[in-house]
Amino acid sequence: MLQPKRTKYRKQFKGRIKGVAKGGSDLAFGEFGLKSQEPNRVNAREIEAARRAITRYMKRAGRVWIRVFPDVPVTAKPTEVRMGKGKGSVEYWACKVKPGRMMFEIDGVSEEIAREALRLGAAKLSVKTRFVQRIAE
């Protein structure tokens, strides 16, 4: 699963996801993509599950680009532990996704295969997404 090799600080504030994606909202590598429609935190397990679903359906043909990286540590306290006594330990890594952010891109397959592969991948994610295609010039 994806996670940073090292970070400046071990833990982070929860924060809020405001506004729309400034960068990373257009197709940069592939012919087809999966774009987020709502703000949410997507964890590393979801990203990996989506990647597996996409590559499995494509039968190793074509190429997949993951355009998001889980760089936010999410902490949790153990069950049945009283409040206080400091912040919990890092449970998993997540990525803050804004609306309009390109999450996955694929190339080297037909539109039907791309559409179905990204639909299967989207089912694994906790954000609403839509299929996008590069406009032929």
UniProtKB/Swiss-Prot annotation:
One of its GO terms (molecular function) is structural constituent of ribosome. Binds 23S rRNA and is also seen to make contacts with the A and possibly P site tRNAs. This is Large ribosomal subunit protein uL16. It comes from Rhizobium rhizogenes (strain K84 / ATCC BAA-868). InterPro entries: Ribosomal_uL16, Ribosomal_uL16_bact-type, Ribosomal_uL16_CS, Ribosomal_uL16_dom, Ribosomal_uL16_sf. The keyword Transmembrane helix does not apply. The gene is rplP. It holds the Pfam family Ribosomal_L16. The keyword DNA damage does not apply. Part of the 50S ribosomal subunit. One of its GO terms (cellular component) is cytosolic large ribosomal subunit.
